[in-house]
Structure formats: C-alpha cells, structure tokens
Amino acid sequence: MSDLLDDPTPGQNAPEFSVSEISGEVKRTLEGTFGRIRVRGEVGRVFKARSGHLYYDIKDDRSVLACTTWKGQISGLSVVPEEGLEVVVTGRLTAFGGQSKYNMNVDEVAVAGQGALMALLEKRKAQLAAEGLFAPERKKPLPYLPGIIGVITSPSGAVIRDILHRLRDRFPRKVLVWPVAVQGSNSAPEVARAIDGFNALTPGGALPRPDLIIVARGGGSIEDLWGFNEEIVARATAASDIPLISAVGHETDTTLIDYVSDLRAPTPTAAAEHAVPVRLELLGWVENQGARMANAASRAVQLRRQRLGDMARALPRPDTLLETPRQRLDRVSDRLPNALISGVQRRKLTLSDRAASLRPATLRGLVSSRQDKLKNLSSRLTLRPITQDLGRKRDALDRITKRLNTAQSSRIDRQIDRLSATARQLDILSYKATLRRGYAVVRDGAALVTSTEGARKAAELSIEFADGTFDVASAPSTTKKSAPKPAAPKAPKTPGEQGSLF
C-alpha cells in the first residue's frame, strides 16, 4: 500500500494520444454529442469564396461561432446571411483537426424575427431613396398598346396562367416569358439577370425586345418575398430602359422593387390589366368615333349644300349677264367693214405720197457720191508704214537671237568645265587612283580581306589591280611571315595629282 501511495510518477495509467488521435476523438465526440442543432445569433463577417462556398460568423455579445454553407446548399437557403442580420441557423457542429478549431456546417438559415428583416429593409429603402431611385421624375410612361410583353416569373405557377388569361381576355399580345426562381437565394440574381437580359435584346431581332416588362410573383411571407427586396433587383429595375410593372405578392405586400418600378400593380392580374386596354372597349370607342365623324361630315355636307344653293340663287341669270356684251358686239360688227375700207384707203394714199418722192436720178447721184468717198479713203491707205515697222521688228528679233545663242553657248561651256573638274576630283578621290600607284584590293567573294588571318581562312581570293582582277587559291600556312614593308610612295610632281586612300 505504501508503495502505491509513494509512487513517484502518478498518472501513468492515463491513456496517451497523439495530436491527430485526440483531434479525431474530439471531432467524433463533438459530432456524436450534439448532432443537428439550431443556433441563434447576429451575422458578422460574410465571405463567399471563389469556389462558391459561403463562410460567415454567428455571434452574440460574448462569443463567435464560425459557420460554413457549402456551394450546393446555398440555393436551398430561404435567406442569404447578411452582416447585421439576426438569424437562426440549423446544421451540425464539426471540428477541423488540422487547426484544432470547430465550426458549424449550416444548411438552413431563418430570420430570428420579422423585426430584423424589417429593420434591414428600412435601411436599404433609406439608402436607395437617398440615391434618388424612387423619384417620380424617373418613372417612365407605359406604352398604350405594347406589341411584345416580357414576363419575369416562375413558369410553373398560377401567376403566369393568370397573366396570360387576362391578356387574352383584354387584348391578346405576344408574350415572352423569362423563367426565374421567385423564392430562395437564387431568386434575386436570376430576376436581375432577366431584367438586364430583356434590355439587352435588339429591337426587331430574331428574339425581339419587349416593349413592356412585368415582374410578377404570388403572395407569401416576408421571407418568401425577400428576393425582391434585394439591392441587386432594385438597381436592375432602376437601370431598365424598358418600362416595368411590378406585381409581387398581394396588395398589402410591398417590396423594394415596387418603389423603383415604373408602376406597382397590387396583383399579377392587375398588372396585365394595366399593360393593355380592353380590345372590345377600343372597338366600341372606334365605332363611336366613326359614327361621330360620319354625322359631322353629313352635317358639314348639308351646310355646304345649303350655302351653295343660297349663293346660286343670288347670282344673276346668264341671259342677263350676256345681254350687254351681245349688244356691244353687234355694234362693233356693224362698224368693222367700213373701218377696214377706210384703213386700206389711207394706206394707199400714204404709199402714193412716198413713191412720188423717190426719183431714179437722185438715187444714182447718191450712189456715185458714196463711191467717190470710198476711192478717196482707199488712196490714202499705203503699205509703206507697215513694211517699215516689220523691218524694225525683224532686226530686233535677229539681235535677240544672236544674244540668246551667245549666252547659251557660254553657259554650256561653263557647265562642261565644271563637269570636267568634278570628274577629275572624282578620279582623284577614287580608290582606282590608289590602285594605279601600285596598291591592290584583296577580296573573299564580296567581302574585303584586311589581314593574313582572313586570307588563310578564305576559300578563294580575288586580287584587284589597277588594270584588272585575277583569282588565287588560298593555301594554309603554318609559319607566319612578316609582310615586307611597303615602299614609301613617291611625292607627286604637282599637288593636284595626289590621291587619297580610304
């Protein structure tokens, strides 16, 4: 007994674990003890990874619980966690042995109370109102009779059937349905993409762009309708160039899209009624207007006919109008033969008077005087001044021609002298002049050879002298001989004949 009490190493009978073993035991104990649980708290940090998984914290005034919702479970959430929102999450606790941490895998999120959702809604509402998204001047007028109506809703619910039935009763129109999820975490992004998608269509394209958009959903709780309170939906609605009618929930339900849309309808059926008029009412109105126009035209014709009759009765009779002109014509007709005879007689007397004053002798004298005058003028016209002037002009032309020939010859001589001087200078500066003094140019093909090393490496050499070029074969040499010192060139007799070696 004393040996047991005096054991210097107590606790040796306690089990021993490795770090991995104890982490696994903690994980199994944690998951087996708690199972599926519900935790209430305020959403803290929210982070969505590139993989699609959602990471966030649930906290109270003393502790923080890390939560994870996997990518495949996000679409099943009725409410997407947002920072500051009080929620109740449902899932299972688990532990990560690698870091000795535990967290909660959440597959269901519910708002802890409608008060929290309403507070978040009021916060978003105030923010969007401050940006001017609810301003009345931003509202676009609805087309009176749209040719194509785009409907964004669930394709399988009663909402689309009610809208199509109401449109068919009032005024059948072409309808394009963009199917979306109207509940859950995917609802808001799908509705926003549908609004943007309708606006991106080309008018008159294969899939024509609608003239009016209806966003519709049936009634439900605030959690069910929460997708239409998301900021992404409100901003897509505000950015739409196509007029938009919102018909979400019942008449007592109001969402953010209702404030931003161009018209809020209490129900989807009411949205269809706002979209198109009643065809029968239009036909009745057209018939009524046609009848009114026909009556007005008939009254106008009767009035014009009555005025025409009154004016016709006020006009004088045609016989009365023509009586005076007829009398005047008769009087003129009676005087016309006598007037013609008198005019002819007066013309004959005038012609006789003029013919009596014309005598042949007078005419001959006038012609003779004109001929004498012409002869006098001809005698005074001589060619001597013209001939003298032409002679002077010819002498001047000869002098100018001689001067021009002399100047041209002088200019040509100067150009020839200048060209000869340039040719002599070119010959002096050319390497050909150097070759004539005993030098040579060695080439390997087109390349110059300037050293013995280059000559040994060359396959074939060509040497250019002043009087021609010949080819030589390059032979390898094992001994290097010094090149003979070139003789100093003789001084030229005249400075003008010295060349230049480049």
Swiss-Prot record:
Start and end residues of each stretch annotated as Disordered: 474-502
EC number: 3.1.11.6
Superkingdom of this protein's organism: Bacteria
CDD domains: ExoVII_LU_OBF
Cytoplasm listed as a keyword: yes
Location(s), subcellular: Cytoplasm
Alphabetized GO MF terms: exodeoxyribonuclease VII activity; nucleic acid binding
Pfam families in UniProt: Exonuc_VII_L, tRNA_anti_2
Enzymatic reactions: Exonucleolytic cleavage in either 5'- to 3'- or 3'- to 5'-direction to yield nucleoside 5'-phosphates
UniProtKB keywords: Cytoplasm, Exonuclease, Hydrolase, Nuclease
One Gene Ontology term from the biological process aspect of the record: DNA catabolic process
Composition-biased stretches (Low complexity): 474-495
GO terms for cellular component: cytoplasm; exodeoxyribonuclease VII complex
HAMAP family reported in the protein's UniProt record: Exonuc_7_L (MF_00378)
Subunit structure: Heterooligomer composed of large and small subunits.
Assigned protein family: Belongs to the XseA family.
Functional description taken from the UniProt entry: Bidirectionally degrades single-stranded DNA into large acid-insoluble oligonucleotides, which are then degraded further into small acid-soluble oligonucleotides.
PANTHER family referenced in this protein's UniProt entry, alphabetically: EXODEOXYRIBONUCLEASE 7 LARGE SUBUNIT (PTHR30008:SF0)
Protein name: Exodeoxyribonuclease 7 large subunit
Species name: Ruegeria sp. (strain TM1040) (Silicibacter sp.)
Encoding gene per record: xseA
